[in-house]
UniProtKB/Swiss-Prot annotation:
Pro residues bias spans: 1-12, 272-285
Main location: nucleus
GO cellular component, one term: nucleus
Name of the protein: Transcriptional activator ptaB
Subcellular location, record wording: Nucleus
Subunit structure: Interacts with somA.
Gene: ptaB
Origin species: Aspergillus fumigatus (strain ATCC MYA-4609 / CBS 101355 / FGSC A1100 / Af293) (Neosartorya fumigata)
Keyword tags: Activator, Nucleus, Transcription, Transcription regulation
Length: 729
């Protein structure tokens, strides 16, 4: 069927239809499922055939790929570019033509990126990763277009990684490696983009200078370009360019031989115009060229007027790219900050538990000690302190006394080695440290704090006895996991003896039967008494729960810790002797803090009053009385040593000041326990209560004033009779 010659090229019956060209405007476009148009859906997740590239089934950049590249455009856009009347519109509107060319260039770059991504997916088993060797061909414009389109970002790896036969740890490691590689690639691409922008600006400046030097004879390429707009647009929309630089123009039509931009001949002033074989000018210079409707006398003035516009239009694109790179750089910086925070968090998570492990290692070394001699033991403990304690570390060792309670002694690092040695030379054979329920937390100074609510120390002594101490422990570690302060609070202690030492004592305490003791003679009983009775072994610890030598060391160490200021002052001033250093230090402290109330001088009455609050000096107006009346400072009820709660009946016995009670002038030994003492009057004595017997001569007692005649003598009571017998006898 012959085709109608008047139909537009987009119609199916139009002449010169290319077999791979786009269908007409009224036909439905058969777009590949993996190909996306600017207004169509975007493929962001691979389907069952994710390993295949989006353009599967197409050939290379030589033949049918041209039609495939044309299929990236929507139906309206393809039909628009094939209509001749729109070419005239572009020629009349240079800005619209430049915008259209820029969009067309971005579409070609998108197609190339999809092809490269498909090749990378085939190389990496369908995973759309961005490796350094896969994106080396991208230039600045392609990078900007790729990053501007959010739909062209890499596919989410979560579903694919879940299907891979790797453990969670391997997946996390792979994600971290891929993330690091992507960051490095982004940094490299940003650097390349900056270099490309600089080169582009230099080339555009050179092109602007060449355009300024051109003469009016340049209207011939524009006329030829206006005469053949359809062929130029077809060639621009069909021919793909793998790496098109921004200054490079479109390809030459088929009727003209292709020539590089550097080989374009520059026409001299006054030269005749060439009507036919002239290479196409760059596309960025076309909008600024002379329009067909202008007069010839305006042509010499046109290039100087259009040169600033050309430079502005050429500089517009690099400025837009620089503005577009600014948010990207901010995003990269934000990602770097997040990565640093994540790395610090991972380091913190990795360090969590290391302080507890260091404390358990400390306890293990303390428990595994075996004595090899005092000299070698001291070297061992010095190495022990250097390994686990900070140079400024402190041990706060606690002791417990049932009467006084808990107390702590502070030992600095230089004395710690001698402290541990003193423990093992004072009768302790082994020390076992048990830490229960240890918890670790961060310290404000950047270290770690390990706290245990229940910590036990078990001491084995040379006499087979054991001592158990229970308390709490708080250990402060620095960033090197060394102890800055080890705080041990002892709540109680218990001493245990082995059963083998208690069995002989139990046998000796068994009582013998009376029959056996009667049968034995007195000599045998004396021999058994003379035999040494078994007794408990002597305790090797004091009431504080530590050996005597250790307690003495703690007391001396506490004194030395309070004298550290004096030691430092003496070391800073070696010209002073110890007494002179002490005297100068006291004078320095007095000058810095001029308050004599805090100086412990015997001539200071305020300190004496503070030390003896119950003295006579603190008893009001009597403090200036005569020394002979010092006893008047006592309470009016008498000495507090005699009665803390005196009887109210004794209040009337208190005389005026200057008089002494009678009972206090005489010895009152047995006054409180005497049977004849009155409960109300302290100094009154009573006669002994005895039965009065009269008329002893008559031989009988009186009954109601009448003596009984001939009656038998009544026997007195045992109590009274005993006394009477002694008196009568």
């Amino acid at each position: 069927m012959p085709q109608h010659p008047g139909l537009p090229p987009g119609h199916p019956m139009a002449p010169g239809q290319h077999p791979n060209a786009h269908p007409g405007a009224g036909m439905v476009q058969a777009v590949h499922p993996g190909v996306s148009a600017p207004g169509g859906p975007q493929v962001t997740q691979g389907g069952p055939m994710m390993g295949m590239p989006p353009g599967a089934g197409t050939t290379g950049p030589g033949g049918p790929v041209q039609a495939h590249a044309l299929s990236h455009l929507g139906p309206a856009q393809a039909h628009l570019f094939q209509q001749p009347q729109f070419a005239q519109t572009f020629a009349n509107n240079p800005q619209l033509l430049q915008q259209h060319q820029h969009q067309q260039q971005i579409l070609r770059q998108r197609m190339m990126f999809q092809q490269q991504q498909a090749a990378q997916q085939q190389q990496h088993a369908g995973l759309p990763v961005s490796l350094p060797n896969g994106t080396q061909g991208l230039n600045a414009a392609q990078l900007a277009a790729m990053q501007a389109n959010s739909g062209m970002r890499p596919v989410n790896l979560q579903m694919h990684l879940q299907q891979m036969p790797h453990g969670p740890q391997n997946i996390q490691q792979q994600q971290q490696q891929l993330f690091a590689m992507q960051q490095a690639q982004q940094a490299q691409q940003a650097h390349q983009a900056q270099q490309a922008q600089q080169a582009q600006q230099a080339q555009q400046a050179a092109a602007a200078a060449a355009a300024a030097a051109a003469q009016p004879g340049q209207h011939t390429p524009q006329q030829r370009h206006a005469a053949h707009p359809q062929n130029m647009h077809d060639a621009q929309s069909v021919t793909p360019q793998p790496q098109p630089p921004p200054h490079q123009g479109s390809s030459t039509p088929q009727s003209n031989p292709p020539q590089p931009p550097s080989s374009q001949p520059q026409q001299q002033p006054g030269a005749a115009p060439q009507p036919h074989p002239t290479p196409n000018p760059p596309p960025q210079q076309l909008p600024q060229a002379q329009q067909p409707g202008q007069q010839p006398h305006q042509q010499p003035q046109q290039p100087p007027q259009q040169q600033p516009q050309q430079q502005q239009s050429q500089q517009g694109q690099p400025q837009g790219q620089q503005q577009q790179m600014t948010p990207q750089e901010a995003q990269m910086k934000a990602q770097q900050t997040q990565n640093q925070a994540a790395m610090m968090m991972q380091q913190r998570m990795g360090m969590k538990g290391t302080s507890i492990l260091a404390l358990l290692t400390f306890a293990e070394h303390l428990s595994n000690f075996t004595s090899r001699g005092e000299a070698q033991d001291l070297l061992y403990w010095q190495a022990f302190v250097d390994k686990f304690y900070s140079p400024v570390g402190v041990l706060r060792q606690g002791v417990y006394n049932p009467q006084a309670g808990s107390k702590q002694f502070e030992i600095s690092t230089p004395a710690l080695a001698r402290y541990y040695l003193t423990q093992f030379t004072s009768g302790i054979r082994q020390i076992q440290m048990l830490v229960e329920g240890a918890r670790e937390r961060d310290s404000p100074n950047g270290g770690r704090i390990v706290e245990s609510r229940r910590t036990s120390f078990i001491y084995w002594f040379t006499n087979e006895s054991q001592l158990f101490t229970n308390g709490t422990l708080i250990a402060h570690f620095d960033h090197n996991n060394k102890i800055e302060m080890l705080d041990i609070v002892v709540m109680n202690h218990t001493e245990y003896l082995p059963r083998s030492q208690l069995q002989p004592l139990e046998l000796s305490e068994q009582k013998q039967s009376p029959k056996v003791s009667k049968n034995l003679g007195k000599r045998a009983q004396q021999k058994q008494a003379q035999q040494a009775a078994p007794s408990l072994p002597e305790s090797m610890v004091t009431a504080n729960g530590v050996p005597t030598a250790v307690m003495s060391f703690l007391e001396v160490a506490e004194t030395i810790s309070h004298m550290q200021m004096l030691f430092q002052f003496s070391q800073q001033n070696p010209q002073f002797s110890p007494p002179e250093a002490l005297r100068n230090l006291v004078n320095t402290l007095q000058s810095q803090n001029p308050n004599p109330g805090f100086m412990p001088s015997p001539m200071n009455p305020a300190m004496q009053q503070g030390q003896n609050l119950r003295g006579p000096q603190m008893n009001g107006p009597n403090q200036f009385a005569s020394p002979a009346m010092a006893h008047l400072g006592l309470p009016p009820q008498g000495s507090p040593h005699l009665s803390a709660h005196p009887s109210p009946a004794q209040s009337h016995l208190a005389g005026p000041p200057g008089m002494v009670q009678q009972g206090q002038m005489q010895p009152n030994v047995g006054q409180a326990t005497s049977a004849s003492a009155s409960p109300q009057v302290t100094n009154k004595r009573r006669r002994a209560s005895t039965v009065k017997v009269e008329n002893d001569d008559t031989g009988g007692p009186e009954v109601n004033g009448t003596a009984t005649q001939g009656a038998a003598k009544v026997k007195a009571s045992p109590r009274v009779g005993g006394k009477r017998q002694k008196g009568t006898a």
